[in-house]
């Protein structure tokens, strides 16, 4: 049998299973429809009692009667002997705590009934007053006349002034219809039932709170009477609660929610009654999980103390709660102020010397010479001699451009060259005439020349170096002197004047 045949056989078997499953579903469909029809609420009934049946139930009446009976007795702690679960009042406390959940569901049903009936008269009131109990009280106060919104003292005790103003303005423009007397009576009956159920719920809370301090005083001090009763009911009694570890107590009351495709950001997994208690919810959200673990650990200790009927006055509970609050305060303390530290002392390492005779000598020795500076310098807009790469090597730049072609010729700057006076120029001229010319390179006069001479005839003879100059000057005074005048010569024949 090939691989393709095996795959085809598997597909045929899967198809047969689907057909068989579909037949089974078709047979069970009527039963499912019957269940759904029973769970749906028919809010179109004439009276609220057709949908809200808790108020007239036997279980509700028995629990409330037992609560009133035990409140009047005022049992003492010395009467409880043995396990707490053996006390007859313990079962009443657990049943009363469960009854509060049913009352909440009943209030939601009655609120929906009143909302559907009163939308005929004032359809906008549902969006203006979202709270269920406030809506029920407002409907009972207004009734069929919406003019009661103005200057109504009873309504001011239910709603805020801003909400009353919005309700009165909306009531003046609403397009609702007047209710008949029968419809108004049914609404009043539903409102009265809802308010009485709410009062019964508060009565149960007061009773559970007073009795939890009697059955489990230390546990109720830490997490409150209502939360203590809830976790005791889920655990199956105080004895079972005392045997549970803290990690399991923290999860009591956790519900697995199926969101069917919705966002899971608001889901809090592994959270139970302790997480939603007042002592944990008073903290910021980022500390609540940590606080729930701490409170669960202390609740375990308190439950074990209560199960042995020790510390009936709640001394251990107060100590544990003080320890919890101290840790909560420690967690919420701001971080310590960071100390301002001074900068560390700098490391005095060997510094670079930027002055001194030795440094200047080194700079002169290793620095660029004037010739190199001239060779590196180029003129803007002028073509270089080796622009076409005819010669090998680097360009000479400005070096020797304005000279005679010698590489080392000094460049003369007319603005900065040395100047001498005219008197010094005449003196140098005279010396060049006497000594046959004198320059910076060549000088005919000896360095030992003097006006004193030694001769074999006269011995010591003083010679005037300027005597020869005077002879030349006297010879030149006749024709070339600046003091010479024009001479008037009279010719013998022509009679003309000549000079």
From Swiss-Prot:
The keyword Phosphoprotein applies. The modification N6-acetyllysine is found at residue 438. The keyword Ribonucleoprotein applies. One of its GO terms (molecular function) is ribonucleoprotein complex binding. It holds the Pfam family Prp31_C. It is found in: Nucleus; Nucleus speckle; Nucleus, Cajal body. Keywords: Acetylation, Coiled coil, Disease variant, Isopeptide bond, mRNA processing, mRNA splicing, Nucleus, Phosphoprotein, Retinitis pigmentosa, Ribonucleoprotein, RNA-binding, Spliceosome, Ubl conjugation. Residues 7-37 have a biased composition (Acidic residues). Involved in pre-mRNA splicing as component of the spliceosome. Required for the assembly of the U4/U5/U6 tri-snRNP complex, one of the building blocks of the spliceosome. PANTHER family: PRE-MRNA SPLICING FACTOR PRP31, U4_U6 SMALL NUCLEAR RIBONUCLEOPROTEIN PRP31. This is U4/U6 small nuclear ribonucleoprotein Prp31.
């Amino acid at each position: 049998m090939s691989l393709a045949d095996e795959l085809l056989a598997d597909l045929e078997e899967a198809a047969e299973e689907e057909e068989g499953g579909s037949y089974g579903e078709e047979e069970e469909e009527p039963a499912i429809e019957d269940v759904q029809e029973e769970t749906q609420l028919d809010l179109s009934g004439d009276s609220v009692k057709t949908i809200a049946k808790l108020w007239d139930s036997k279980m509700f009446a028995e629990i409330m009667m037992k609560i009133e009976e035990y409140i009047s007795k005022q049992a003492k702690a010395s009467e409880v002997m043995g396990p707490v679960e053996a006390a007859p009042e313990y079962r009443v406390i657990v049943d009363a705590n469960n009854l509060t959940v049913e009352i909440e569901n009943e209030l939601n049903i009655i609120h929906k009934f009143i909302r559907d009936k009163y939308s005929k008269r004032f359809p906008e009131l549902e969006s203006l007053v979202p709270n269920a109990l406030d809506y029920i009280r407002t409907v009972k106060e207004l009734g069929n006349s919406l003019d009661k919104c103005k200057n109504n003292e009873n309504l001011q005790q239910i709603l805020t002034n801003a909400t009353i103003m919005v309700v009165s303005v909306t009531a003046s423009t609403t397009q609702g219809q007047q209710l008949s007397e029968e419809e108004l009576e049914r609404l009043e009956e539903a409102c009265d039932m809802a308010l009485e159920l709410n009062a019964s719920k508060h009565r149960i809370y007061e009773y559970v709170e007073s009795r939890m301090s009697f059955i489990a005083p230390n546990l109720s001090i830490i997490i409150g009477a209502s939360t203590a009763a809830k976790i005791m009911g889920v655990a199956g009694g105080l004895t079972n609660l005392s045997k549970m570890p803290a990690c399991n107590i923290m999860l009591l009351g956790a519900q697995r929610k199926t969101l069917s495709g919705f966002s899971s950001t608001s889901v809090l997994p592994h959270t139970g009654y302790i997480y939603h208690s007042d002592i944990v919810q008073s903290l910021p959200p980022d500390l609540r999980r940590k606080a729930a673990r701490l409170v669960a650990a202390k609740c375990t200790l308190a439950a074990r103390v209560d199960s042995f009927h020790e510390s009936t006055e709640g001394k251990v509970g107060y100590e544990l709660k003080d320890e919890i609050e101290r840790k909560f305060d420690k967690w919420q303390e701001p971080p310590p102020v960071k100390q301002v530290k001074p900068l560390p002392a700098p490391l005095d390492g060997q510094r670079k010397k930027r002055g001194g005779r030795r440094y200047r000598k080194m700079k002169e020795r290793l620095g660029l010479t004037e010739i190199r500076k001239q060779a590196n310098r180029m003129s803007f807009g002028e073509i270089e001699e080796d622009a076409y790469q005819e010669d090998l090597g680097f360009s000479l730049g400005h070096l020797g451009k304005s000279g005679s072609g010698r590489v080392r010729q000094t460049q003369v700057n007319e603005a900065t060259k040395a100047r001498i006076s005219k008197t010094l120029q005449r003196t140098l001229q005279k010396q060049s005439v006497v000594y046959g010319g004198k320059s910076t390179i060549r000088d005919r006069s000896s360095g030992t020349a003097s006006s004193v001479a030694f001769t074999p005839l006269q011995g010591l003879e003083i010679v005037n170096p300027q005597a020869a100059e005077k002879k030349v000057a006297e010879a030149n005074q006749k024709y070339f002197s600046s003091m010479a005048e024009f001479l008037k010569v009279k010719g013998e024949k022509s009679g003309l004047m000549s000079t």
